[in-house]
């Protein structure tokens, strides 16, 4: 009877198809502890794609229970009891966020039910059913710059007073063993070795339909994920289905302290392409069969653990490279890529000092952007976004970031997190001097805000016409730059409820944000009454001097509006209890 009830919940989840996950959700505290266990070398073979199915979670926890010290085993046993001790956990969460000096606030309340059940050793299901009462949608959440809501909320148009009532149903099923498994569900995804804001697939993007296949052997792992995305136009609106991303990777572990891998990605839309389902294929070559209609990227990763507790990670992700210039060692070449490098030291044994992490991320100009049609109002199926949010790094193109994070654990269940994040960003369009590009920018509607929606191409009715910076990489060479510094302090108390296997999670967080030149992320150029009719005229008919004069006027106006200072304070208090 119990199996029939669980199967009924599974079928209901697949039918409703409107949610995000629970016990294997990428923000579960389990994954934070897993990163610590990976840092000290207790775990060296976890797959790159998260979330993991219950089969893999059980394997990882059993390793810690067997090999960890007293404190590590205590945490692992608490997780084990929560995931595998009871089928259902019922609870609720409440969250209050205040942003000052704007005097804005965000309220979230949600009862929920968690489900973790093994119908068979080879077949597991998990999920979270919840109903949110909130005064903010996903796009309205009060978060620091370049961060996004962790709640998967879609506007359903139902209100109780001033509160939106939004159902969220996150679910997943898995078939297989820890060595070979296939998962299907709706959840957020992250792709290592940097899971927080991965340049491959970042956890900041709202949940997606996901189909994941993994082969995990002692010396190597093959990961493959097919995600169903939401397309938007180049202004972030007009949400449309039919956008997909396929990403696969091969990770090699010749030694316990060394791993490296290659990652291959294709993003496309308006059709389902079976050839991209083939494992161990090269997407760039595969799309060549159809005259290269899609957007392919390729990357590489490495992890080195030279001594216990010390971990070095790195990755590069190439979007579009000027290969002919690069192989000739020419100074000026097209480099559209992102990368992240980090060093972490984790205390090998349970200690009041848990870890310190320093990492650097860059996103070169036009990385993750892509031309897909001559009109900014039509869906873009090839840029690296989902539902209007960056799918890879949470940074915009032409940005970089350095981040220091430190975690203290003075008592069991009590975490004190301190971090400082410094971000630079500049609008690539400030460097545009080409007269053809300037003429189009001031006479036709384009996105010129320097975001992932701002591609390098100008168009006519026949498609692409010209491209910016084909033979150079003006990374952070602009006159007007945005500087953001975020100092974050957080206290978190996470305690198990021994009797039921549930948990209590309380958090109090504060972020001080300094934002210098906040208007950099606004459009620089736009058509107006002065340029009316220019789109149908040639540069000769208009006059180059007249075009440059109008472009200079708009650029000067943008610079005046971009410069300034803002200081923001974010205070967040949350409580979550599951019994």
Predicted regions: what is each one?
Residues 181, 190, 202, 208-389, ...:
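Signature for the C-terminal beta-barrel architecture of outer-membrane proteins
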Residues 22-28, 39-259, 330, 350, ...:
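Outer-membrane beta-barrel channel domains
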Residues 493-495, 565-579:
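Outer-membrane beta-barrel "beta-signal"
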Residues 89-95, 126-130, 183-187, 223-227, ...:
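Transmembrane beta-strands of outer-membrane beta-barrel proteins
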Residues 16-20:
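Sec/Tat signal peptide C-region and signal peptidase I cleavage site
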Residues 99-100, 154-159, 195-199, 233-238, ...:
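Extracellular loop and loop/strand-boundary signature of outer-membrane beta-barrel proteins
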Residues 4-14:
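Sec-dependent N-terminal signal peptides
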Residues 499, 504-556:
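C-terminal beta-signal and adjacent terminal beta-strands/loops
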